[in-house]
Amino acid sequence: MSQEGVELEKSVRRLREKFHGKVSSKKAGTLMRKFGSDHTGVGRSIVYGVKQKDGQELSNDLDTQDPPEDMKQDRDIQAVATSLLPLTEDNLRMFQRAQEDLIPAVDRQFACSSCDHVWWRRVPQRKEVSRCRKCRKRYDPVPSDKMWGVAEFHCPKCRHNFRGWAQMGSRSPCYGCGFPVYPTRILPPRWDRDPDRRSTHTHSCSAEDCYNRREPHVPGTSCAHPKSRKQNHLPKVLHPSNLHISSGSTVATCLSQGGLLEDLDNLILEDLKEEEEEEEEEEEEGGHGE
C-alpha cells in the first residue's frame, strides 16, 4: 500500500473512533477521500449537522462553529449526522470530544501466554483491546495491578525517586536507603529509550529467584527482570491477558503508537493484510456451505 493509502486508512480509523464506530468504514472512506483525509474538519461538520438537526435543548451544550460551505452542504456528511440522531445524555460527551478533536486513549500492556509475546499499544479508552501479531487472537490488557516492566518508585523514607524492573505489587529496595518500596506505575517502553534517563544501578530486588537477590528475600516471589527470567528458564509473560470477548464493534483499535516502539504505518499495513486474509477465509467458508 502506498503512503497515501496508509494516511487515508489512519484518517478513516480516527474519524470512525470519534463516533465510536457508528460511522461505517465505507462511508468514512468516502468522506476522507472527498475531503483529503481531513478527519478533524469532517468530524466537526458532522457534529454541526447533529446540532442543527436535533433541535433539543440539550444541543445547546454543543459548542460548534460553522464548517466550510462544501462540508456544510455535503450530502454524505448530512446523512451521517442524521444517522447519529437523536442527541442524548449518553452520547453528548462523544460529540463534544469529536468537536474538540479528542480521542481519549491510553497506553496498555498486552501479553499472550501461548506465544510468550508481550507488547504495548495505545488504544481508545472505550475499547482496550489488541491483537497478538503471532497468533492473531485478540486480548484485553494486562490488569493494572499485574503489569510489569521498567517501574517508577518513590521512596517514602528517604524521598529518593528511582526506576527499575518490577511487577506491580512487588517491592524493591530503594537504591538510596535500602527501604523496600512498591512501584507506583509501570512505564511504557518509549520512556526508557532516553539514555540520560536510564538507571546506572544494577538491578536488585527481594524476589527469591532474582539474579542479584537482596536479602532478606521473600520466598515464593519471582523477579520481573528479563535477565532473571532468562537465567531461570521462565517465560517472558508474567501475567497473561484475557482473551477479548467481542462486543460486535469492528473498528480497528490501533490509533497511534504515540512514541511507542513500533511504527504505526507498519501496524496499519499489518492490520489490513490480516483483515484481508480474514475476509478471504470467511468467503471460502461461505463457499463450502451447503
Swiss-Prot record:
GO terms for cellular component: cytoplasm; cytosol; nucleoplasm; nucleus; P-body. InterPro entries: SHFL. It comes from Bos taurus (Bovine). The keyword Cytoplasm applies. Keywords: Acetylation, Antiviral defense, Cytoplasm, Nucleus, RNA-binding. It holds the Pfam family UPF0515. This is Shiftless antiviral inhibitor of ribosomal frameshifting protein homolog. The modification N-acetylserine is found at S2. It is found in: Cytoplasm; Nucleus; Cytoplasm, P-body. A motif (Nuclear export signal) lies at residues 261-269. Belongs to the SHFL family. GO terms for biological process: defense response to virus; innate immune response; negative regulation of translational frameshifting; negative regulation of viral genome replication; regulation of translational termination; response to interferon-beta; response to type I interferon; response to type II interferon. Inhibits programmed -1 ribosomal frameshifting (-1PRF) of a variety of mRNAs from viruses and cellular genes. Interacts with the -1PRF signal of target mRNA and translating ribosomes and causes premature translation termination at the frameshifting site. May exhibit antiviral activity. Residues 102-150 are annotated as: Interaction with PABPC1. Interacts with PABPC1. Found in a complex with PABPC1 and LARP1. Interacts with ELAV1, MOV10 and UPF1; the interactions increase in presence of RNA. Binds to ribosomes. Interacts with GSPT1. Residues 49-71, 269-290 are annotated as: Disordered. Residues 272-290 have a biased composition (Acidic residues). A motif (Nuclear localization signal) lies at residues 121-137. GO terms for molecular function: ribosome binding; RNA binding; sequence-specific mRNA binding.
